[in-house]
Design a protein with these regions (language model features):
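Structured catalytic core of nucleotide-sugar glycosyltransferases
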Residues: 1-120, 158-163, 175-183, 188-189
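Acceptor/aglycone-binding surface of glycosyltransferases and processive sugar-polymer synthases
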Residues: 61-76, 81, 93-170, 197-207, ...
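Hydrophobic adenine-recognition pocket in adenosine-nucleotide-binding enzymes
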Residues: 89, 325, 355
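Helix-to-beta-strand junctions that scaffold the AdoMet/dcAdoMet cofactor pocket
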Residues: 103-104, 329-330, 343-345
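Hydrophobic helical membrane-anchoring modules
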Residues: 140-143, 165-242, 349, 414, ...
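Conserved N-terminal segment of class I S-adenosyl-L-methionine
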Residues: 221-313, 319, 336, 351-352, ...
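A short beta-strand submotif of the Rossmann-like class I SAM-dependent methyltransferase core
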Residues: 319-325
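A short glycine-rich, Lys/Arg-flanked "PGG" loop and its adjoining helix->strand segment in the class I
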Residues: 333-348
Length: 436
């Protein structure tokens, strides 16, 4: 089935008598195999009977509130794409055709009042309040979306699988968007003209909605600034925090200046950083599906794999980058032997990790954990020092050519694969592994 159209309703009989025939005609003319699902929240005006008379599927809302209605609709949907729109005719059903054409550009298509070309015909108070809310949320969550609160959306159903949300009313629209974007799904807006509802009354209570939206906004802000967000690394490069922005750009400058021109490059554990985006002939490898989804829109060759078993043939690369990866993994000799294996003779290894022997990192890590409790510091399970890291790479057949620091805390080393590895029996103690 191509599409499921979800209509959350409470006492919308008069509007459904107009909307459902128009939707049916639209699906027929577009030659779409689709269904219309009316999710009833306890109507008392004959909405259920009217919808059933039009031959569409009607289900009871499981739970209470707009969020519960949306969740019920997602669970009932059988189409490859899921369309949600208001049943009050403020969302012109004819616009579905334009949204359908845009589906190849992203996983979520939003009918937007505030992107260029979009218009909202409503009273000044509601228009001003809506614009203010959308600007606030867009900036708080750092989303490339101008109409965060639009409920007129087309979702790829595969993106909704496993999606869980806690919001119960209209604030759920922002939560859904943040959670999907944090999982690496792409969003596109198409300009849309909004008109007030045709009949009936709105079910939004501004004060209650405002308080619920504030609570949801804070929860989603924490998610957007956690490692769970697919674009965490890229956002850090453009951070509004000067120190974080400097740190990220210094790391990028050192790593890219060493790697550029190296030939075929592997960024192992690339995350969503700009390093892999900035290098020609680079392949990004990452275990997290969300980060891979995010990077696919940048036209970069990508592979999913583990640092413990790199999914590449021997001697496949001229340069391997491992930036801010090894401290997140339990120490194992195979991490370094795998990087050596996929490097060609004379190939370059660029390693970046905090130096736990420096006073700088001992000061910065507690401060970082306090200010950003969801950040990388909480994920560091293996602590390296410069001395121990040199011992390890030397033992695995690398010669250290150069080392650089960021704020005397983060160590970045450039190493060269030697023709003859140092004998394996020359072992050095492994670095201390502790839970950060």
């Amino acid at each position: 089935m191509d599409i499921s159209v979800i209509l959350p309703v409470i006492n919308e009989r008069g509007n459904l008598d107009i909307l459902i025939p128009r939707l049916k005609s639209l699906l027929k003319n577009a030659r779409l195999d689709g269904e219309i699902v009316v999710v009833d929240g306890g109507s008392s005006d004959g909405t259920w009977e009217s919808a059933a008379a039009h031959g569409v599927r009607v289900v009871s809302e499981r739970g209470k509130g707009y969020g519960a209605a949306i969740q019920t609709g997602f669970e009932e949907a059988r189409g490859d794409w899921v369309l949600t729109l208001d049943a009050d005719l403020s969302h012109d059903p004819d616009f579905v055709a334009k949204m359908w054409r845009a589906r190849d550009r992203a996983d979520i298509v939003i009918a937007s009042r505030y992107t260029r070309g979009g218009v909202a015909y409503t009273d000044l108070f509601r228009k001003s309040l809506s614009r203010l809310l959308n600007v606030f949320l867009r900036r708080l969550w750092s989303l490339p979306v101008r109409d965060v609160s639009s409920g007129y959306r087309l979702y790829r159903r595969a993106a909704l699988e496993g999606l869980e949300f806690t919001s119960t009313n209209f604030e759920v629209l922002g939560e859904i968007l943040v959670r999907l974007y944090a999982r690496g799904y792409g969003v596109v807006e198409v300009p849309f003209t909004y008109f007030p509802r045709r009949a009936g009354r709105s079910h939004i209570r501004l004060l209650r909605f405002g308080m619920a939206q504030l609570r949801s906004a804070l929860r989603m802000w924490k998610l957007r600034n956690s490692l769970e967000s697919a674009d965490y690394d890229e956002r850090a490069y453009y951070s509004i925090i000067p120190f974080q922005r400097y740190w990220q750009r210094r790391r990028h400058s050192i790593t890219v200046s060493w790697a550029r021109g190296a030939g075929r490059i592997l960024d192992a554990g690339c995350g969503s950083s700009l390093i892999v985006q900035s290098l020609n002939n680079a392949v990004g490898m990452e275990f997290n599906f969300g980060k891979l989804r995010f990077l696919r829109h940048h036209g970069i060759p990508l592979a999913r794999g583990s640092a413990f078993a790199l999914p590449f043939k021997d001697a496949s690369f001229d340069c391997v980058i491992s930036s801010q990866v090894i401290e997140h993994l339990a120490y194992d000799e195979i991490l370094f032997s795998e990087m050596r294996r996929v490097l060609r003779p004379g190939g370059m290894l660029i390693l970046g990790t905090p130096d736990y022997a420096t006073i700088g990192w001992r000061i910065i890590e507690p401060a970082y954990r306090f200010l950003l409790p969801g950040g990388y510091a909480d994920e560091h399970i293996t602590h390296y020092t410069r001395e121990k890291l040199i011992e390890i790479v030397t033992r695995h057949g690398f010669a250290v050519e150069e080392a650089a620091y960021i704020v005397r805390s983060e160590l970045i080393m450039r190493c060269r694969k030697c023709d003859l590895p140092i004998p394996a029996q020359q072992r050095a103690p492994s670095p201390e592994s502790t839970a950060a």
